[in-house]
Amino acid sequence: MEPLRPQITYGPIETVDNEELTEADMLSFISAAVNSTGLIGYNIKSFDDLMDNGIPQIVKQMFNVDITYKDQRDHTEIDKLRESVQIQFNFTDVNIERPQHRNYSQGNKINLLPNKARLSGLSYSGPVKLAAEVILTAHYSNGRQEVKRASIPPFQVSTFPIMRGSNRCHTHDLSKTAKKEIGEDPNEPGGYFIARGGEWVVDLLENIRFNTLHIHYHTMQQGNNEIIRGEFISQPGGAFENSSQIIIRYMTTGAITIEINSTKFSKLRIPWYLIFRMFGMTGDDSIIEQVVFDLESNSPVNTFMIEILEKSIHVSDPIFQPVQHELNREKIIQFLSEKVSKFVSNPSAYKSDENAVQYLNERQLTILDKILLPHMGQTADTRVRKLRFLGLLIHKILLVIMNVFPPTDRDSYRTKRVHGSGVSLAKAFKAIFNTSVIAPIINGFKELLKQTAFEELTQRNIIEAFSAALSKNTASDLNRSMEQSIISGNKTIMVRQRPIVNRVSTQSLERKNLLNTISALRTVNTHSTTNASKQTERADMMRRVHASYPGYICVAQSADTGEKVGMSKQLAITANVCTAGEVLSLKQRLLSDPAIQQLADVSNKDIVRKGLARVFINGEWIGCCTNAFELAQRYRMLRREGKIVHPHTTIYWDSMVDEVEFWLDVGRLTRPLLIVDNNIEKYNEACYKAAEARKKGNKDWEKHKISFVQNTRFTSQMAKAILAGTLTLEDLVAQGICEFITPEEAENCLVAFSITELRKHKHDVTRRFTHVDVPQSILGLAALVSPYANCTQPARVTYETNQGRQTGGWYCFSWPYRVDMNRFFQFYNEMPLVKTIAHNYVIPNGLNTIVAYMIYGGYNQEDSVIVSQSFIDRGGFAGTFYREEKVELESDIESFGKPDPLITKNLKPGANYEKLVDGFVPVGTVVKKGDIIIGKVAKIRGEKDELNKYIDRSVMYGFDEPAVVDAVMRPHGPNDEIFGLMRLRYERNLNIGDKMSSRSGNKGIAALALPTSDMPFTEDGLQPDLIVNPHSHPSRMTNGQMIETTVGLANALQGVVTDGTAFLPINVQLLSERLAQEGLRFNGCQKMFNGQTGEYFDAAIFIGPTYHQRLQKFVLDDRYAVASYGPTDALTGQPLDGKRSHGGLRLGEMEHWVLTAQGAMQTIIEKSHDDSDGCISYICRNCGEPAIYNASHPIYKCMNCDVQADISMVDSRRSSIVFQHEMRAANVNITSVLSPRVFQPA
């Protein structure tokens, strides 16, 4: 039987004509990739997979309950005969519907739309409905059994958070017009959750690759004699199944132990050979053969391995000393059962019962079958395969010990996976569902069987008990816990008073602009480990850009300061995250391939002697082959056909260990690459003919030779078709022009960095490229915003990725229907004159400003910028700032309305109630400090006084800056409580102290608003909007901004928009000619006049349009904090911090340094002591205890010393006094020792 081979043939590569293909045309390939998957399509696909496959699989397969407990009921004679009761139930149907909420006015449930959830503070959750089958079996002492069965019809258990834009969302597949009608942004992709009215993003989370051995050297610590360890997490399937971890350790004593991380094994370190003996392999030679493969080989590596293994077998272990030399598998299993079976309370009695011994032994083997390497099988007939695989793991660890192979690279994405929201929420759901649903059902049945005789049970009793266990409280537990897992992030949450570690990494979605929203949805977080926060070499390596990042992780975008540097990353522009594929069909196809010998048909000796390569699928060892390279290449060609092998299948040949790996698990990063074909077969054949002709003495032997040609089949016509929308990425994949490559398979590829590099080596047979890349694909969306980023210092590009997310703009098109807290809406946004490919996917967030690079007075130092007053007056960077006020009616005695001063007490003094209409200030009204914006009163219960029926609980506007009421709403909460929701609008023109930034990361602060009459101007009368100091560029090396200004000047004069995407070629000669055509110098500099004196400047000034963005850091928001007074804490008296509490600005460490450098130490003392919580305390010198002082009646008194008291006045702090009170409350006394009195001579 011939192996399956690809059927599609491609035309000769020599005939492909793509000489017209340019670097700019290659950008269309990025557009095709983004249009195919969407920038956040993987996140929605991950959640859809959870809804369609994950939750049903988890509930149906992992929660098949089967428990037996001793019957406690003894009311009747039948009860006394009943020994035990077996409870069995499994869920037969799981369905998660679209979000709904109860309409209390109509008494029914209606569809819950996303904007309704935002405004009403609801959670966008869909009902979870379950159906189950229950079997209750009573076991009697006389051997009789009685069975009761019941079918639980589908009913709602709880609700589950629904992702906006998923297939369970009401906006799924809606047209743009339909989305507008329900108050949604028609261009918004979704991908986030709405929990309690707020928007949250579940981050992509890095994780190690399952079913892979990770070998690491272990740091020698006190009390730890471990040299090296191998960690292996085994997971069958590849997505939502439970996993099991084993740790193989090599100790300084020579022992090799295996630890099975399971609650059933109590983390015992079992000698490795005992695992083999328990599974029936008792001979030492046969056990060692599973590791070394060939005992008869005399190679140095083989000999050294045998020495290590023989020594490890004879190393004494204090725990397993009784069975160290035991060959009887039953005794070994029995010994292990005694160690791990917690219910064996009386071992001596248990050993005398043969049935009990046999039961425990079988039970132990069954547990081992399920938790030891479950990806290799979970039944008894797979034990031999597991032992062979376990021997292979130990073999690889020994190779690392002998320095044959290096340990696992922890930072390489070859051995990593990125888990989306679906996998993260599945982990949280498993733990929460078990605690909040399964446990109450079991307890409910136990209570039913305790109260009701088993023979009297009916199907109705069972259904009612099942439903009662999942009451409203249980439903709220599941719903509340899932919401908490999203809101709290990676922390411990409490479910039914049980702590559960939450593995979901989330962040609040701050809608500053569309770029910020998309970047939040493309964030990849690394697990926060203890090593990450330490100043160690490991912490430094974790943060570096790894060689496996390009094309998958943006090499420029990360946090610029703090612990998140290098730990919080972004996906590259074309990177995508795969869901789990269909493993079974590919496995069957591989096992039926004649080129692959199944594992059971291959002996260990044959692997070594015949040089066979091992074949794996999702980490499962299924067989061997003779030619690994040919097998990998053949299946890659089949993948290009797309009929037998899925296009997203990873096919990797590890030449170091000669293994072929097929991966279809969840979380693989992938990206499309253009395939490079060549004529190597024809070239080799021609060279062979030429060599034969030369050998025969043929003088025309060179005529047989042909040129080696390698090229891509991607052409400029295809690039134009992509831009026209007539060609997609799926079409390119189907035609075999591109394919998806993961970080593993990238190690088998030689990728040309660009089409230019490919053409440079088109006829170079020593550089046979497999693929050609698009240079821009190594960057993420935020980094691609920066024009000519490859000409700018990389650190500045990193700064821009963070500044670009903070810029003002249109954060969404549905802003009129939303009420958001602290959102800035910029009025005027322009498309840059020098755009990049990123602007095809995000709306612009800045303005084309005329910038003059010059020194003009003392107000534009490096970070300072002089702004033209006319630019501000024309609306430059002007916008609206929104705040919200939200008030809830806490009970039925409260109501909205204008308080009547005749029957309401506790009216706020000095407050203005006159603007209220029906409890709210009307839309369009200007409110100032002291105005009541929401009127609310509460009726006093039991009050008989007609003049004091109500108490005022109104909300007063407390900011110094006037605001305009923009919107007023009265939504209903989840329990029909009424909210008062008000949106306030503020004008935010550019002010002195506000920040702005170019797209090259060059940030500046508005230092002076100069009148138009004083601004410099050119000979043509052109005045700059901004004056930037040229000294800010050499040290920052923002060459990209200089190029942008030059190109922008030519574009403005010629009325065109050009592409300044990073890595596009720059023709300096052509740019100079364009400037010369417009009558300018070749470098863009112009002669300018001083606006204050009218004189020429001695030097020509570089002036031109540069795209600037305003950062959302407003001086007006901080003005209230700059004062000598403000609110203080009621307990400590210290000033409050934060905008919400109207607190002050923190006097930080650098501020202390500035004051210290100026010699203003007294100012530091005043600010940190007198203006903080400084106070006077009175202490008795005799006993050191606090004394009593009454200022109104000059009384000094010590409770201990009475009239003998010697009381002194001491400078202190209120926080210190509070601390002393707390210590005394804990029965710890604190006394003060004062310096002795010093009397001055008269």
Curated annotation (Swiss-Prot):
It catalyses: RNA(n) + a ribonucleoside 5'-triphosphate = RNA(n+1) + diphosphate. Keywords: DNA-directed RNA polymerase, Host cytoplasm, Metal-binding, Nucleotidyltransferase, Transcription, Transferase, Viral transcription, Virion, Zinc, Zinc-finger. It is an enzyme of class 2 (transferase). It is found in: Host cytoplasm; Virion. Signal peptide: none annotated. GO terms for cellular component: DNA-directed RNA polymerase complex; host cell cytoplasm; virion component. It comes from the Viruses. Induction: Expressed in the late phase of the viral replicative cycle. InterPro entries: DNA-dir_RNA_pol_su2, DNA-dir_RNAP_su2_dom, DNA-dir_RNAP_su2_hyb_sf, RNA_pol_bsu_CS, RNA_pol_bsu_protrusion, RNA_pol_Rpb2_2, RNA_pol_Rpb2_2_sf, RNA_pol_Rpb2_3. Catalytic component of the DNA-directed RNA polymerase (RNAP) that catalyzes the transcription in the cytoplasm of viral DNA into RNA using the four ribonucleoside triphosphates as substrates. Forms the polymerase active center together with RPB1. Part of the core element with the central large cleft, the clamp element that moves to open and close the cleft and the jaws that are thought to grab the incoming DNA template. Part of the viral DNA-directed RNA polymerase that consists of 8 polII-like subunits (RPB1, RPB2, RPB3, RPB5, RPB6, RPB7, RPB9, RPB10), a capping enzyme and a termination factor. This is DNA-directed RNA polymerase RPB2 homolog. The lineage of its organism: Viruses, Varidnaviria, Bamfordvirae, Nucleocytoviricota, Pokkesviricetes.
